[in-house]
Each structure stands twice: as structure tokens, then as C-alpha cells.
């Protein structure tokens, strides 16, 4: 089976890194086309032996990219076209249909209650999404929560399959030596209590709440933020105004899999933390929180479908808190008062094993190739 993955960009992001990890475990021939920004993940895919095509799209309305994508799909002889992220889902589904590929799968990575990839969920966004969705065979939701959102949007339930994001749990297993080495590299005192946050530095992630919480905590508490984005400048200003600039460390974008770039990879950064905090009020999955649980960290979160969809007891060490500085400050104080516990991975780490996700996705591919065009989908 030959599968073409179409994605909007290949910078360091959750969907992009999840794609790279999945491709390492899919027993089919995969190629990837990125509409824009090849980025670090493109280099990682190439290092893994995956052929990556760059379409060179200049913006959302660069319609000249569509015929180029159609030609690429036709030449490739693909059995399945699998699209990821809003723009790629729209262009990829259309291109696949024009190229004669009917087995089209799309993964919905980022649908929230009020936004998708930073876009407000207005009438136009919804209408365009549903128009494109009708050209596909299957829409994959990364969590039952996202599946419910898709149904409320109007996506027919028979066309929705849940394939959770997966992690390589062994990569995140805690290592005391790695913790000490990473703290030395980052200049973090061995005795400091380090609160960590991972994600795009964007307003919706609400990392400002963690900066506010830090100002309410003792001076030996540090905040380690892993990620990059448009909110970084505002967060630095907020830290200066709160008097905690010297206690906040911005680590930048870091890959889950070491890629040869300077600086520690995400598993090492998680090892350096004492508590993982996720103040985002709206998530589609919450992959970073699952990775933190795999690293044996206590997790405090505002929204995390990956945790909330689990059976009781599968995410020991994870607790929900309010999206407020005072709530996170209390959570840090409580966790610290309990003392250091053994850093053992939670059951959630095994529940979201990437090999299980890959096996479920292979089932989706097989069904998409085998079955006729579903009711409600367009046909030529």
C-alpha cells in the first residue's frame, strides 16, 4: 500500500511530530507533501528515509498550488491520501478527488469548542470544512472528545473513526542522570523546584497563567517553557513586570526525537521538571500531558481529553485545576509538600502506545480502500 500524507507545514508542532512518529510504525510505503514551511520535522522525516515533497504554497489562497498537488498525486500512484490540518485537509481532499484517488482519510488534530488551529469557528470556517469533508472517506478524530465535536458540527457519525495520538513511552522514561545533566546544561539549580509547560506560545495556551502563578510562589521555584510562538514577547514582558524574569526559562521549540540540533530534546526537558502544568482551557487531545505522565511527572491541567477519556485510575498523578494563577500556585505548593515520589510512568503511557495507534490507523486505511464511496459523499 502506498500512502501520501498531505500536511500544511512541517515545523515543530504536535501534529507534525505525531506524523513523524506514526510513519516510523506504519507498515506501508509513505511519502509526505507539505504545503508550506518544510521546517525541522521535514528534515527529520528525510533522515528517517521518508520522501518529502515541498509544494511551495505562498498563502491560504494560493490556488496555483492545487494543480501542482493534483499532478503529484497522479504521478505517485497512491492507494490512500491522508490529510492533516485545516488547509491541507481542504486542498488535499480536492486534489485527491481530481486525481482519481477515492480512499481519502483526514485526521482532525485540533478541533476545539471555539477554535481550530487558532481560527475562530465561524460559519465560513465550518461551511468550508464540511464541504471538503464530503470529498473524503473517513475523518479520524484524535480523541472521543474531538469525535463528539465533529458530530455536533455535522460530520456523519459513520465517517468518523477515533485513532488517538500515540507516544513512544520508552523514550520518555525517567532517568536521574539525564535529569542532572539537563539541569546543568540549562543552568537550573539542582535544588530548584521546576514547573514545566510545553506547547506553542500562543494566547490560547494561557502560559501567562503560569507566569502569574510563579509570582505567588517562593523564589526557588522556576518555570521552564518549551515551545515558541507569537506570545513569547508578551510572556517575557509579563515575567519582567511580575518580577520573575530571572526565574523563567524559555527553551524554545524542542523535538520529541533528537534531531541533531543544539539543546536537549523533549524527554530530557521533562526529566528536568518536577511538575507539568497545562493551563490551556481548550485542547483536542493534550499530547504533552501524556508524555509528561510517561516521564512519571505529576500533571496539573485545565483541559486534556487524553486524560479525561481514560478509565478511572489510568492517569494517576494527574489532576484538573482551574485556569487561574492562584489555582496553579496552590497545586504547585501541594505537590511540593508531598515530597518527591518515584518517577514511574502512569498507565496512560501504555494506553497511548504509538504501536496501538498505528495498528488502528492501518485498519482505517484498509477499510477506506475496500469500501465504496459512503453515503453523503460526493462522487464524480
PLM features: residue spans?
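N-terminal strand-loop element at the rim of the active site
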Residues: 5-64, 149, 229-230
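A conserved mid-protein helix/loop that constitutes part of the nucleotide-sugar donor-binding site
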Residues: 13-21, 193, 197-216, 230-236
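Short hydrophobic beta-strand element within catalytic cores of glycosyltransferases
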Residues: 34, 298-302
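Nucleotide-sugar donor phosphate/pyrophosphate-binding loop at the beta->alpha transition
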Residues: 63-67, 102-105, 112-135, 148
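Short alpha-helical donor nucleotide-sugar binding micro-motif in glycosyltransferases
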Residues: 73, 253-254, 261-264, 268-273
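Carbohydrate-associated surface elements
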Residues: 145, 166
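Aromatic "clamp/platform" in nucleotide-sugar-dependent glycosyltransferases that forms part
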Residues: 281
Amino acid at each position: 500500500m502506498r500512502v501520501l500524507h498531505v500536511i500544511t507545514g512541517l515545523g515543530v508542532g504536535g501534529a507534525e511530530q505525531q506524523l513523524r512518529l506514526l510513519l516510523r510504525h506504519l507498515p506501508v510505503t509513505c511519502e509526505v507533501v507539505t504545503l508550506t514551511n518544510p521546517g525541522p520535522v521535514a528534515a527529520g522525516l528525510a533522515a528517517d528515509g521518508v520522501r518529502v515533497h515541498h509544494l511551495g504554497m505562498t498563502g491560504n489562497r494560493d490556488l496555483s498550488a492545487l494543480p501542482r498537488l493534483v499532478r503529484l498525486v497522479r504521478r505517485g500512484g497512491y492507494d490512500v491520501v491522508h490529510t492533516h490540518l485545516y488547509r491541507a485537509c481542504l486542498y488535499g481532499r480536492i486534489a485527491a478527488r481530481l486525481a482519481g484517488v477515492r480512499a481519502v482519510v483526514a485526521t482532525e488534530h485540533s478541533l476545539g469548542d471555539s477554535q481550530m488551529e487558532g481560527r475562530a469557528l465561524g460559519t465560513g470556517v465550518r461551511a468550508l470544512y464540511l464541504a471538503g469533508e464530503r470529498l473524503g472517506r473517513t475523518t479520524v478524530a484524535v480523541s472521543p472528545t474531538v469525535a463528539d465535536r465533529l458530530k455536533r458540527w455535522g460530520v456523519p457519525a459513520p465517517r468518523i473513526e477515533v485513532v488517538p495520538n500515540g507516544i513512544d513511552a520508552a523514550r520518555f522514561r525517567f532517568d536521574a542522570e539525564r535529569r542532572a545533566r539537563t539541569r546543568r546544561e540549562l543552568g537550573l539549580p539542582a535544588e530548584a523546584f521546576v514547573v514545566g509547560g510545553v506547547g506553542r506560545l500562543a494566547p490560547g495556551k494561557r502560559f501567562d497563567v503560569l507566569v502569574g502563578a510563579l509570582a505567588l510562589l517562593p523564589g526557588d521555584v522556576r518555570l521552564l517553557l518549551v515551545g515558541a510562538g507569537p506570545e513569547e514577547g508578551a510572556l517575557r514582558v509579563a515575567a519582567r513586570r511580575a518580577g520573575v524574569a530571572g526565574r523563567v526559562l524559555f527553551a524554545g521549540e524542542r523535538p520529541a526525537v533528537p534531531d541533531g540540533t543544539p539543546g536537549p530534546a523533549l524527554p530530557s526537558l521533562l526529566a528536568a521538571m518536577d511538575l507539568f502544568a497545562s493551563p490551556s482551557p481548550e485542547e483536542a487531545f493534550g499530547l504533552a500531558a501524556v508524555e509528561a505522565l510517561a516521564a512519571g511527572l505529576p500533571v496539573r491541567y485545565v483541559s486534556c481529553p487524553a486524560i479525561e477519556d481514560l478509565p478511572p485510575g489510568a492517569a494517576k498523578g494527574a489532576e484538573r485545576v482551574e485556569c487561574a494563577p492562584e489555582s496553579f500556585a496552590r497545586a504547585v505548593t501541594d505537590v511540593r509538600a508531598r515530597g518527591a515520589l518515584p518517577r514511574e510512568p502512569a498507565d496512560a503511557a501504555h494506553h497511548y502506545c504509538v504501536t496501538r495507534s498505528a495498528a488502528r490507523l492501518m485498519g482505517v486505511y484498509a477499510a477506506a480502500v475496500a469500501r465504496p464511496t459512503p453515503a453523503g459523499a460526493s462522487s464524480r
